[in-house]
Structure formats: C-alpha cells, structure tokens
Swiss-Prot record:
Name by which UniProt lists this protein: Threonine--tRNA ligase
Similarity comment text for this entry: Belongs to the class-II aminoacyl-tRNA synthetase family.
Subunit structure as annotated in this protein's UniProt entry: Homodimer.
Main function: Catalyzes the attachment of threonine to tRNA(Thr) in a two-step reaction: L-threonine is first activated by ATP to form Thr-AMP and then transferred to the acceptor end of tRNA(Thr). Also edits incorrectly charged L-seryl-tRNA(Thr).
Positions with a binding annotation for Zn(2+): C333, H384, H510
Catalyzed reaction equations: tRNA(Thr) + L-threonine + ATP = L-threonyl-tRNA(Thr) + AMP + diphosphate + H(+)
Species: Rickettsia bellii (strain RML369-C)
Subcellular location, record wording: Cytoplasm
Amino acid sequence: MINISFPDGSVKQFEKNITAFEIAVVISTSLAKAAMIAEINGDLKDLSTQIDNDCRLRILTAKDPECLEVIRHDAAHLTAEAVKELFPETQVTIGPAIENGYYYDFARDKPFTTDDLAVIEAKMHELAKKNEKVTRELWDREKAVEFFKSIGEHYKAEIIASIPSNEPISLYRQGNFIDLCRGPHAPSTGFVKHFKLMKVAGAYWRGDSRNEVLQRIYGTAWATKEQLESYLFMLEEAEKRDHRKLGKELDLFHFQEEAQGMVFWHDKGWSVYNTIEQYIRRKIRKNGYIEVKTPVLVDKSLWELSGHWEKFRDDMFALETDDKTLALKPMNCPCHVQIFKQGIKSYRDLPLRMSEFGLCHRNEASGALHGLMRVRSLVQDDAHIFCAEEQITDETVSFCKLLTEVYKDFGFTDIKVKFSDRPEVRAGSSETWDKAENALKEAVEKAGYSYTLNPGEGAFYGPKLEFVLTDAIGRQWQCGTLQMDFVLPERLDASYVAASGEKKRPVMLHRAILGSLERFIGILIEEYAGRFPLWLAPVQVAIATITSDLNDYALEVQKALIESGVRVDINISPDKINYKIREFSNQKVPMIAVIGKQEKENKQVTIRRLGTTEQEVLSIEQLIEYIREENSKYI
C-alpha cells in the first residue's frame, strides 16, 4: 500500500500502481469527470500516470490556474490535428503554449489565408466535440524517427533525432493525429472548448534566419467562455488604443526606415515628453537626488572593466576612431560610478542618490522593434543610490514610497511586486546575499507591498525588485525596478571612508521608476486612449470662435494664456463652430474655450470639457488660475 497526501491534509492508502484518475474516481465521480491533470509532488502529470510511491497529490480541473497552460497546449495539438485533416500535405513542427494563447508552426508551400483559419477553427470545434481520447506513448528513438519520416514529417524526425539519448521519446495520440510532446495533456479533446485562431505570421525554422520560413498560426484558448470573450474585448480595445495609431492621429511622433528604432518626436509628443521629464525632475529633487549628465560615447575599456562588454557586446553600437573602440552606452551605471569616484567620499556623504535622464542605445533586432515599446535609442529615468549596507532598507522604503506617488499621479494604483532572489551562479558570499535579501524583503513590507517570489531570477550581482502596473484594460506592464549590486563598485574600485577610518565598498542600488521614457509614454497613450490629463496634455486649451469678428478677442485670450505658460491651440477660421469643436475633440484637447459675442463683451470664455456636454463660463483670469493650480500639483 502507498500513502497519498491531499491538499486538505488528509492521508489515504491505495494499492500501488493506481493512476491519478482512478484516485479521482474514488474521491468523487464529479471530480473525475472534471479532472484534467494531476499534480504529483509539485509536478504536473497526466491523469493516466501510475503512482507507486507515497506522494502529495492534487487533482486539477479547468478552474485551477495551472490548467490554463495545459488547455492552450491541448489547443495547439487540436490546431495541428485540424490542419493535417484539412491540408494533409502540410508538415507539423512545434506548437507551445505562450502568454495568452499558443502557436503552431507549419511547413506548407501555399500560405494560409483568413478563410483557411475560419475553416481550421470550425474543424477544431468538430474534433473537440468528438471528445477524442488523448493517450501518451513511449517510443524507441529509431522507431520514432523512421515513423515520422515514413509519413513525411521530416521536421518531427529532425527534432526527435536531436533529443538527448537519455531522454524518453514521448508521443501523444488523439484520433488519427500523433505528436511529439512531453505533456501533460488533458485526457480528451473535449476539454478544449473556448478558443479562437487569431492570425498567421512567418517564422524561421528553429528561430534561425538561415533556415526556411514556416507559417505560424497563433491562437488563444481559455477555461471559460467569459474569459475568452473578455480577452477578445481587451484585444479590440487595445487595437483602438494602439499608441502607434494614436501617435499618428494626434501628431505626437513617427518612425521611418532611415532611422529604425529611433523616434521622430513631433511638437505635441515632445511636449508630453518634456512635461514628464519636468515632473520626474521635481519629484527626485524633493527626494534628495542630485542630477548628472554623462557621455553617450565611452571607450570600450570602461565596458570591459564593468563586465558589460563581455555580456552585452552584441547589443551595443560600437565604432572605431583614432585606433580606439568607442561604444554608445547601453546603460548609465558605469558612468555614474566614475562621478562617485571623483574626490574622496566619506560615510557622511552616504547615501548619495545620483540621477540622470540618460540617453542609451541598444542594438535591438529589427524584428523586435515595436513603436515606442521597443526602440534602439531610449532615455531612462535612471538613478543609482550609493549607500552603506545598513542604509539599504531605508533607501528601499523611500524608493518604494516615491514610486507609489509617481504611479498614482499617472493614474496607476494596481501595482504588483516581484522579488527575484539569488541565482545558482552568483558573486558574493551567502552571508552577503542573506543580508541583501532580508533588507529588500523588510523594505518592501514596510512600504506596504506584498510580493511574489521569482526564485533564482536575481542577477548574479544582487537581488532585485520589479514593479508591475495594471492598465485600464487589464494588461500588465513591468516598469519600475530596484536592483542591488555588490559587484560593480568592486570592479570599478568605488569606495568610501567609513566612520572607523577604514576603506569600504558602497552598495549600489540601480533604480528606475518609469524605465524608458519612450516606452512609458507609449503605455500612457494606451492607458489614456490618447486623452491625456490636463497637466500632461500637449494642448491644454483650444480656442474656437463662433464668428470671424471675434478673432481679435480670441488672439487676446491666446496671448494671455501663452504668457501664463498654458499650452494653447486656436482656430479662428471661418469654419462653423461645431466643426471646430469636433476637430479639437478628435485631437483629445481637454478644454475647449468657445468665444461668442457675449464672451467678448464680458471678457470671458465658455469652457467645454472633453467627453462632456457641460459648459462653464470663466473669466480669462479664472481659467489661467485653474490651469495653474492643476499644473502645480505635478510640475
């Protein structure tokens, strides 16, 4: 007999070699009917897995989050089965689950069309309704290679031949379809109910541009109909909010082939950029930071000392001049250490909080570039805090509070924290890591945050915190970071004189709140759907006249607003007032100042706010004072 421990703490005895599914039947027939996979000692397994030793067991259903990836993997196999039935000449390759869905790569001479996707999806529903049994089989390697070659699946044969000889060849069969896979999978195709094929794209075999191009079908799959509909609605909303689309419509920025990954900021976009920089500058000054500016182009010798040349050389832009190799900096930290090293530093100088809006360059692959979200030239709201070990907790708490304030001002209140602790390969002693991790954990808790642990995901030089924002349509964006570093001060010989008179290495805290300004602006455009709040809007007030005889007064209002620092646009053309209002509304201007005969006589304007039909009559002075008050909260 073997002892099986269950999540409720109970322990029951069963005969050896019983399957997880058979145990589910013993527990209840309803559980057995809903069961998808089993978790045995923390590992996900098929329900058909035989258990011959004592273990911890969970029977998982579609309600358990662990099953979502299984559903998506099952959907990938279902897609491949449908394609093979409809287009038997097609070869299958790989089909993993990914975030929010899955994909499957196919080799086929004729490209899949939108109509093909609809037919494939219909076939998938047909196969799912058949509720075909899914079974796992272990094959001999040579037999598996020969089998897949014999049915014309040369890509599968190549994959199997490349699997290490000590690994079993695991195949899954459903209906007439068989695929190479580690699993686990649900016991039948009927568990895949809520899915949709999304698009077709090209993909290189094995991700190598020297290889042939395959056709990648992307799909999404969910546990419930409501989840699928919610996701599709989010995608629809995201398309409307796409920062690339809105950037063009609102005349904020553009990209072009001659400068891939580099932003051409237009006047309005540059206004948003500068306002954010001004806002951050005000915040960091209030929090005791100094601001510096370091070179963009630095000799490779510094990058060799810091270790960046070895690790990031392929992502750096370099050039040869005067028998030297110079590189555009991909990050600011080594340069900040150079400033710290100027002059003798004492413990009284710590903590030293050094910030920079640092212009960095990274040689991203052209295929990875994505509007403002992934660029080659970027500015970070970067800072490095040089401190003593005993100051780590307080500095981290202060940073968390500052970060919370900033995110709140931009409208983000749902913030999640990920804590990445020591990796297997790391610098520094276990004692040093213990201190660092405990200091970060204590600080995060003091700042009022809970966190999820990313075991082993810290950098080799120290643990880190990642701050993740949730936007208006439920997407998550990792923006802020705090990274502890024991190594760089050592490598670049940074030191301070302790109270005892001995020379010590400072701890270096790398921290950013927004990350790259370019990416954060992209996030904001999508968060606000282009409707920037008044303090941030590139045009705060648009002036529109009802008739041309009011133009002189409109220009007078414009002059007064500009002199008061208000960002203004004006339309004194002969166009009708409704057209002017509509045009300014399409440009997402938060306040439209309408000027008619009565407004001119009373030295007033009638304010219409974006998205409402309400109107408010204000004097010029009242309007200026209102905008000043709004601005003063942020900049």
